[in-house]
Amino acid sequence: MLQKKIEEEAAKYKYAMLKKCCYDGAYRNDDETCEERAARIKIGPKCVKAFKDCCYIANQVRAEQSHKNIQLGR
């Protein structure tokens, strides 16, 4: 589900460089926030926006998936 959401978001960007920024933002990094990671981007504001958008979407999907009810067969 996460991959599908990120693919949909990346498809909104016309240029390959911006798509890469989006995919980079989707990578999991529990040590830093999206803002902290985006602060290191030097390419330009469009890349930063794509990075943050995908980072926030990925974090949201991960949070939703981690709270699913799991039934154990006992």
UniProtKB/Swiss-Prot annotation:
Signal peptide: none annotated. GO terms for biological process: complement activation, alternative pathway; complement activation, classical pathway; inflammatory response. It is found in: Secreted. Residues 72-74 are annotated as: Required for 90% of C5a activity. Residues 15-44 are annotated as: Involved in C5AR1 binding. GO terms for cellular component: extracellular region. SMART domains: ANATO. Keywords: Complement alternate pathway, Complement pathway, Disulfide bond, Immunity, Inflammatory response, Innate immunity, Secreted. Gene3D superfamilies: Anaphylotoxins (complement system). Residues 21-55 form the Anaphylatoxin-like domain. Disulfide bonds join C21-C47, C22-C54, C34-C55. InterPro entries: Anaphylatoxin/fibulin, Anaphylatoxin_comp_syst, Anaphylatoxn_comp_syst_dom. Mediator of local inflammatory process released following cleavage by C5 convertase. Acts by binding to its receptor (C5AR1 or C5AR2), activating G protein-coupled receptor signaling and inducing a variety of responses including intracellular calcium release, contraction of smooth muscle, increased vascular permeability, and histamine release from mast cells and basophilic leukocytes. C5a is also a potent chemokine which stimulates the locomotion of polymorphonuclear leukocytes and directs their migration toward sites of inflammation. This is Complement C5a anaphylatoxin. It comes from Sus scrofa (Pig). The gene is C5.
